[in-house]
Regions:
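Short, amphipathic alpha-helical "lid/cap" segments that border enzyme active or binding sites
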Residues: 48, 75-78, 160-168, 259-266
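Structural motif corresponding to alpha-helix initiation and N-cap regions
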Residues: 13, 41-44, 71, 75, ...
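N-terminal Rossmann-fold cofactor-binding loop
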Residues: 27-32, 40-42
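A hydrophobic C-terminal alpha-helical subdomain
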Residues: 212-273
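Conserved Rossmann-fold cofactor-binding substructure of NAD(P)-dependent oxidoreductases
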Residues: 37-55
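Oxidoreductase cofactor-interface core, primarily capturing Rossmann-like NAD(P)-dependent enzymes
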Residues: 1-24, 42, 52, 62-69, ...
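A general structural detector for well-ordered alpha-helical segments in enzyme core domains, enriched
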Residues: 73-77, 109-110
Length: 273
């Protein structure tokens, strides 16, 4: 049996859609919504029942929080998986070129924890940053200007739907991907000029300090300020353009062309707008 966690989230819900109706799949949500098992990593007592009878766990990262919170969640999940007799964990991690991001630590800790497990087989999906994310951090303002501090840097963004397809491929045939690490970044790196041109906007990158101040007064949680500013500066300084890793995306999509990240960005901007 395959258990997918976090199916009320953006990535997990896409995975759940692709697995709908399969009798060998169960879905997990923190609240234990109808038709799902309650999987609350902040309440480890819920996990033995949730993991009962599970052979493969697709652990969608519970990365919304401070490092110690996320690490504790993932430790609870992996300890419970070991105790329940889960054989294989597929984990949605962060691209290998993302080590300069402040939220990389919890991902790398989880990867190390998986590798050191005496009983678990594993597959690590090192997901690149979503094309949809760009709609949240680099959308044009009311004056049709994109002022996100991306500098002249570029992001090898990847469509969330493609990552969901890969997760399903791996999680439904885990033995074929045993103890493998896959890099999943986009094939086309996008810069601020690209984003502006497709929207008929102007790219006028602002200062990182201005972005930090704006995030701080926007109602963001304290841990989100360094998350977002590190994303901006990693893009601006060329660490997320895809040249630092070799992407396995197309191979794991069965050879099909990945979705166009620029198209995904445009659609997301229009939905958010």
């Amino acid at each position: 049996m395959l258990l997918v966690t976090g199916v009320s989230g953006a990535l997990g819900s896409l995975v759940a859609d692709r697995l709908a109706g399969r009798p060998d799949v169960v879905l997990g949500t923190r609240a234990g919504l109808p038709g799902t098992r309650r999987v609350d990593f902040d309440a480890p007592g819920t996990l033995p029942e949730a993991f009962a009878g599970v052979d493969t766990l697709l652990l969608v990262s519970a990365g919304y929080g401070e490092d110690d919170t996320v690490v504790a969640r993932h430790e609870a999940a992996l300890s419970a998986a070991e105790a329940a007799g889960v054989r294989h964990v597929v984990y949605t991690s962060l691209s290998g070129d993302g080590d300069h991001l402040t939220y990389a630590l919890a991902h790398r800790w989880t990867e190390r924890r998986l590798r050191s497990s005496p009983v678990l087989d594993w597959t690590i999906l090192r997901n690149g940053l979503y094309a949809e994310l760009l709609a949240g951090i680099a959308a044009p303002d009311a004056e049709h200007r994109i002022t996100a501090p991306l500098g002249r840097g570029r992001l090898a963004a990847v469509a969330r739907a493609d990552l969901a397809d890969v997760a399903v491929t791996v999680a439904t045939d885990p033995a074929a991907h045993r103890n493998r690490v896959y890099e999943l970044v986009g094939e086309r790196a996008l810069g601020g000029d690209d984003l502006a041109a497709v929207l008929g906007a102007v790219y006028a990158p602002g200062a990182l300090a201005d972005a930090r101040a704006a995030i701080a007064v926007s109602g963001a949680a304290p841990f989100q300020v360094p998350m977002l500013t590190s994303t901006y500066t990693a893009i601006a300084h060329g660490f997320l353009d895809g040249t630092g890793v070799r992407s396995d995306l197309r191979t794991l999509l069965g050879g099909r062309e990945p979705l166009d990240a620029l198209d995904v960005f445009v659609k997301a901007v229009r939905v958010d707008g």
